[in-house]
Amino acid sequence: MWSQSFLGSAPKLCLFSSSLPPFSHHKIHKFFCFAQNPSSTVSINLSKRHLNLSILTLFFNGFLLDNKAKSMEELQRYTDSNNGFTLLIPSSYTKVEKAGANALFEELNNGSNNIGVVVSPVRIKSLDQFGSPQFVADKLINAEKRKESTKEAEVVSVGERAGLGQQVYEFEYKIDSTRGGIKRVFSAAFVSSNKLYLLNVVHSDKPENPLDSSTRMSLEQVLHSFDALPLT
């Protein structure tokens, strides 16, 4: 643990010395800092044990941050040229076929965690013609509440961002269902070329096994990556 006391003016020169023989078990390192006033000195003692602990702490913190960064990088680009959309998908998810979905990806060995995209023709040219982000969020949550399996549903957040030539609405909501318990849902929607694009990212968020921050950040990246392809 570092302790420091400055006397007089700012330190000008620092020297390193050892207070005990090199092979002493409790070797103490001393850093003597001489200020501009020779009579004002600062002595900082740091035991070898504390030094080792500090190094280990830095090492493991760096290791954990590195692992977290790697987990954030485990996303791959998926592009559907026929339907005109693109997004990032976690590498642990595999594509499956299901009626009603233009694209569906499920987590390996845990199909309840999934990412789905549905594309439908509409008459409107932009999403704001349908309503505000809050209006659309209310429609989504009311649709969830009408399901027999839904015990409770609540909107967590509502947002909006600029996509490729169109506005993208983003939503986060929480559902407690008889089918799989509590789930966290991230949704995004936009209209392009008279088509409604809807993304649903569903992940388990049970009290005994809550959604961890690293996974959440990855799923948010998926949400923010959902966009239309450039018109050719």
Swiss-Prot record:
Intracellular or extracellular location(s): Plastid, Chloroplast thylakoid lumen
Source organism of the structure: Arabidopsis thaliana (Mouse-ear cress)
Annotated organelle transit peptide span: 1-34, 35-71
Keyword Plastid appears in the UniProt entry: yes
UniProt-recorded Gene Ontology molecular function terms: calcium ion binding
UniProt-recorded name of the protein: PsbP domain-containing protein 2, chloroplastic
Predominant subcellular localization, coarse grouping: plastid
Keyword Thylakoid appears in the UniProt entry: yes
Cellular component annotations (GO), alphabetically ordered: chloroplast; chloroplast thylakoid lumen; extrinsic component of membrane; photosystem II oxygen evolving complex; thylakoid
Biological process annotations from GO: photosynthesis
Record InterPro entries: Mog1/PsbP_a/b/a-sand, PsbP_C
Membership in a protein family: Belongs to the PsbP family.
Keyword terms: Chloroplast, Plastid, Thylakoid, Transit peptide
Record lineage: Eukaryota, Viridiplantae, Streptophyta, Embryophyta, Tracheophyta
Pfam families cross-referenced by the UniProt entry: PsbP
Gene3D superfamilies registered for this protein in UniProt: Mog1/PsbP, alpha/beta/alpha sandwich
